[in-house]
Structures are given as C-alpha cells and as structure tokens.
Amino acid sequence: MFRTATLLAFTMAAMVFGQQVGTNTARSHPALTSQKCTKSGGCSNLNTKIVLDANWRWLHSTSGYTNCYTGNQWDATLCPDGKTCAANCALDGADYTGTYGITASGSSLKLQFVTGSNVGSRVYLMADDTHYQMFQLLNQEFTFDVDMSNLPCGLNGALYLSAMDADGGMAKYPTNKAGAKYGTGYCDSQCPRDIKFINGEANVEGWNATSANAGTGNYGTCCTEMDIWEANNDAAAYTPHPCTTNAQTRCSGSDCTRDTGLCDADGCDFNSFRMGDQTFLGKGLTVDTSKPFTVVTQFITNDGTSAGTLTEIRRLYVQNGKVIQNSSVKIPGIDPVNSITDNFCSQQKTAFGDTNYFAQHGGLKQVGEALRTGMVLALSIWDDYAANMLWLDSNYPTNKDPSTPGVARGTCATTSGVPAQIEAQSPNAYVVFSNIKFGDLNTTYTGTVSSSSVSSSHSSTSTSSSHSSSSTPPTQPTGVTVPQWGQCGGIGYTGSTTCASPYTCHVLNPYYSQCY
C-alpha cells in the first residue's frame, strides 16, 4: 500500500521509461534460479531471470542521446503528447550492479537501497528473455528465504504478485516495442500515476511534478495485487488487494481514486503486530528478523483443487530448522485466527472502523481469479514519499491514539521513515531474497514442527481440507473412512487412517498425511 510515487531512480540525470528500444547499453537479464515443486517429483530448477523495471531505465531520443525526461519534466519537443513520445523515445539496457545495486547469484538476489545517485529498485522474474514468469497459485504455495537484518525502519523489502501481462503489454499495445524484455507493463492496486508509459503511450498529459525527480500524469495503471511480503526488520505484512478488473487497466479520474476506484488500495492485511501479537516478529523475537528465515504462503481453495475458489491465504515460517505457525489474532471482535479469509477481513474492517472496500471489490474470490490467470512476481526495495512507511512499521494514522485497535503496526517512531533522512543515514541498507520455490502444498519447505507450534486457529470458514503441516484440522472418528483430500495420518493425529475408495493415504510430511 502507498506505493505510488515512492520509487525513485537517478541515473544519467533522468528517471526514465520508454517504449522503443535503444542500443547504447547492452540488454541483459541476470539469471536467478527458482524451483517448481510437486508431490510426485520433488523440486526441479527453472532457468528464470530478472529484468529491471522500465521506470528506472535511461530514456533518450531514438536518433541520439537527448533525454526524453530530465529531472521531473518531459522534453516538450520529443514528447508533446503520449503517442508522439512513444515513437520518439527509446529505452536502453542497464548496469544492474554498478548503477542499481542489484546482484543476482545462483538463487539469491540482493537489492541495495542506495547505489551512487540511484535510490531503490524493482525487478521482475522472467521465464525467458521476452516473457515474465507467470504464477498460477490456486491450491499451491509460494516460498522464499529472506534476510532483512539490514533493513531498518522506513524501508520496505517487498515481494509481491501483480496481474501484469506476460509480455509486458506488447501484444495489446502495438506502440510498445520494448515489452517484458525491458520491464514494461507495470500495474498494481494503487493505480499509480507516476508510471511514465501506460498502454504503450507516454503519461505526459496533465503531468505535474511531485518531487525533484518524479511526477504524476492524468493516467494510472491498475490491476489486482497480492502482497506476499512487505517488511523491514521491525514489521511485516501480507495483503491481498482485489480490483474490479483483474487485468492491467489504464485509469483516469475517479477510477484511479484509492479504494473507491477500480482497486482496493488498502487491501486486507495481516500484520502480526497490528493483529495484537507484539512479540512475534522482530529482532530477537519468535521470528527473529536479525537472521534469515523462510516465508511460506499457501493459497487454499474451497475444494482442494486448482479449479476451486480461493477461500484462505495461510502463512507459516521456518527458521533454524523449525516450522513456526503464524501468530493468532488478539484483537477484540476478531476471531483468534492466523490466516486471511473473507470473514477475517470483514471482522478486521469492523474492529478497526474501516470501510470494507476489500469485499466491495470482490474479496478473496476476485484475487483468486487473478491467481488462476497468472500473476507476475515483483521484488523491490523502496522508501515511502507518501507516508514514510508508517502504515507498515509505526502508528498510523499518526493523529489517532496508538491504543486504538489497528493503529499500532510496529515499534518504529512516528518521526521515522522520512526519505531524505533515511537515504542519507542508511544508504547501505539492503534486502536479500533467495530460494524462490512454488508448487504443490507442503512441498516447498522442510522443518521440524514442535507440539507447541501446532495450532488449530485457521479460520473455520475455509472448507478446504488441504491443510498446512503446521495446522491441526478436524479429525475423523476411528472406523470412519476419510474422504478425498481429508487427513488420514500424522504425528498427533487420532482419527481414521482409512481412505474412502478409490483413494489411498499419502504421507506428505511426518505431521500430515492426506487421502487422494
């Protein structure tokens, strides 16, 4: 949330974006290995790569090296209107490490906060040189390791899914000649208006400077977003954001408005601190952010298949070889659950006095449709010119009593996160994402589940029986056959171990066996 107009890049005297292809700097896509995992075949490597978002690239005239955009203004001659600008201006390649502080090695990606005059970055995972890797995650899970020990208050090391086009919009918009190869086609639930090119045209009409290096135009670019991870070493949240239109859509006027427009910009977040457990995640806490750990997110459907409807999003962690169940809610008026469901979101909005825009935009079902079609993985590091990241790690809004439910989100001071200060004081901050895996439930992680971490706090509104190894689903009485997708075994399980015909009991891990 609040991602609009916060990602800044200062390179070659311009923050740049374009739709033609330049030749001054060679185009490259650093390799970043990921893995696809199945119950039958285990995990196998994918030859995935990364590409820098086009908003960071140098934009110059196709006939030379005149900047099409300098400081916070478009060149009036090259860019008198959106279509002319798209024809006149070209994107170039990128020096990932030297200019942008982006280093990929094996399955590990390091994003440096400040490198020279560049601040922040955003990259996408690619399946090949011309297409983004598309993630279809219904009845699947997504796992990664993160080291955010050097990510202080006010910064956000984000890993999230966006309903972008696989080719970056080339097929839809013929004036876009660069495509995914150059990181085009961005959209999210904030309907950002600071994106330089949308739908193959420059966003020059109505352009107004908002800072020394950025501005906003008449248009925004909207799509459903799934924030798997927004965090620093003081706070973390995962948040689904539905839009009434899942595919990338250009907005104008009231359609771009937060929450009442095409998208639910605030979303339905699960931040452990905000949900009442202030000892769960942080430096030296249950999930110790001073050390690396694994984050697992499971997308549960109503029928336990990829054809079903998204009804629940679960979270668990693995650190020091131990599986850690997500924290449970400790807020009056909200059931003590530890996952996101439509019921949780409804109760949360009521308890916090917020309008339920999440439900108005279609809730989990709508997010699930984007996950069914396929979403693009974005990884970024950024600071927040709109709200100083207080919505993530401090008290927000700052004019409300911190004791009011939903206001306190972390321990960072309300004076923290000012971009000018954090860029000067913490230029060497960074985040490392590694070991990206996705696939069948309970196949992308390993770890020991202690009895104290086993919880039955998943929402009862989910009708799925594909449960995480760290949860305790209802057991079947002994002597009763277990239906397809039901639990049939595991440490601590006391129910029936006989599956209904023609299904058999399969061991998924020591703590959970399932009929299928």
Curated annotation (Swiss-Prot):
Q: What PROSITE patterns does its record include?
A: CBM1_1 (PS00562), CBM1_2 (PS51164)
GO terms under cellular component: extracellular region
Q: Where does the record say carbohydrate is attached?
A: N208, N326, N442
Q: Which InterPro entries match?
A: CBD_sf, Cellulose-bd_dom_fun, ConA-like_dom_sf, Glyco_hydro_7, Glyco_hydro_7_sf
Instruction: Indicate the secretion signal residues.
Output: 1-18
Catalytic activity annotated for this protein? Hydrolysis of (1->4)-beta-D-glucosidic linkages in cellulose and cellotetraose, releasing cellobiose from the non-reducing ends of the chains
Q: What family classification does the UniProt entry report for this protein?
A: Belongs to the glycosyl hydrolase 7 (cellulase C) family.
This one is known as Exoglucanase 1
Identify the species of origin.
Phanerodontia chrysosporium
Question: What does the record give as the organism's lineage?
Answer: Eukaryota, Fungi, Dikarya, Basidiomycota, Agaricomycotina
